[in-house]
Design a protein with these regions (language model features):
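Conserved N-terminal phosphate-binding loop of PLP-dependent enzymes in the Aspartate aminotransferase
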Residues: 1-344
Length: 344
């Protein structure tokens, strides 16, 4: 589910919220109470967010954030990090003329890459699609300072990472972004995205402003999605997050031990309740490291499928509050048997 189903499939309170919302209607031409309640929950939860604009996906949220940054700064260029992911849409795809890509973790490159042509710097607390590799907090803070030094906005992509801390990873890492991207868990398993941040930036999209930044979408803030997202966030308590993260830590330790004991070494990278399993025994500290041993990675994926364990082909695992001790034990056994199969 690529981090979206924090409470698992068909979580009863979310299913009930969707059903109750659908009875009232699905698409309205103006604001709906469920949208307001979801926005209020996000604002209360994420310190950097004064206002929220809803979209239909994380990719749409990233595109809107860039449009806001360009309007606010009068600039065009954006900066991302090698191995980062902010949606498979231009200009966030490789080869775009206005996109500059920083080498992962290279603080020295910040001063070389950032200048008065840059509208925004986009960063993830960890590289989600790049192998679940946490970025160094000092590097993230340096990027924020460098962006502000040249008058650019600092945008933190919390599409995946929001689930890992009660107030989001940006707050946990003492970051103060201008804009925050959100999706996945804030929709309770339905399509959603959101841009939150400083009031003066979000107000650029207000239709009451002359020459406002146009942002429209028939299904933005869909009634059922907003209702599902509200329940998803309300049920993701501090205690639930702590328990999930502890399960993930134990699972990571078990997987590495299973591989070492059975002769098929594995390295696990992790951020909160999101893990990525990599073949080999060398540390995985960069996106390049995460792409080693493609045949072994494919073989592990298949071996796990044969044991009834589904991960992404690149080895990502997302835990949910729906997992029982029996479920986790089954995952442990699945990795044990998969490693035995591959080592033989």
């Amino acid at each position: 589910n690529y981090t979206s189903l924090i409470h698992g499939n068909a979580y009863p309170p979310i299913a009930e919220a969707i059903s109750a919302a659908a009875v009232t209607g699905t698409v309205f031409p103006s604001m709906h109470l469920s949208q307001l309640r979801l926005a209020e929950e996000i604002i209360a939860r994420v310190p950097a967010v004064d206002m929220v604009r809803l979209t239909n996906s994380g990719s749409e949220a990233a595109a809107l954030a860039l449009r806001i940054a360009r309007r606010a700064t009068g600039r065009r260029a954006l900066v991302t990090v090698s191995g980062g992911y902010h949606g498979a849409v231009p200009p966030f795809t490789e080869g775009e003329p206005e996109t500059r890509t920083l080498p992962f973790g290279d603080s020295a490159a910040l001063s070389d890459m950032l200048d008065d042509h840059v509208a925004a710097v986009f960063m993830e607390p960890f590289l989600g699609a790049g192998g679940v590799i946490p970025q160094d907090p000092g590097y993230l803070r340096a990027a924020q300072e460098a962006a502000h030094r040249v008058g650019a906005l600092f945008v933190v992509d919390e599409v995946q990472s929001l689930r890992n801390s009660p107030h989001g990873e940006a707050a946990r890492l003492s970051l103060d972004p201008d804009l925050v991207l959100m999706a996945k868990i804030i929709g309770g398993g339905l399509p959603i995205g959101a841009v939150g941040g400083r009031r003066e930036l979000l107000e650029l999209t207000a239709a009451t402003r002359p020459e406002h930044l146009e942002h429209a979408g028939t299904f933005n803030g869909h009634v059922a999605t907003a209702a599902a997202g509200l329940v998803s966030l309300q049920h993701l308590t501090t205690a639930a997050i702590s328990e999930l993260n502890a399960h993930a830590q134990h699972l990571a330790e078990h997987i590495e031990a299973a591989g070492a004991d059975r002769g098929f070494p594995l390295v696990v990278t992790r951020s909160g309740s999101i893990l990525n399993v990599h073949p080999g025994d060398a540390p995985v500290t960069s996106p390049a490291d995460a792409h080693r041993f493609p045949p072994e990675r494919a073989a592990l994926h298949l071996a796990l499928l044969l044991e009834g364990i589904y991960t992404t082909p690149r080895g990502m695992i997302n835990l949910s509050t729906a997992l029982s001790e029996d479920d986790l034990s089954a995952v442990y056994r699945g990795y044990d048997r998969a490693c035995e199969r591959l080592a033989s």
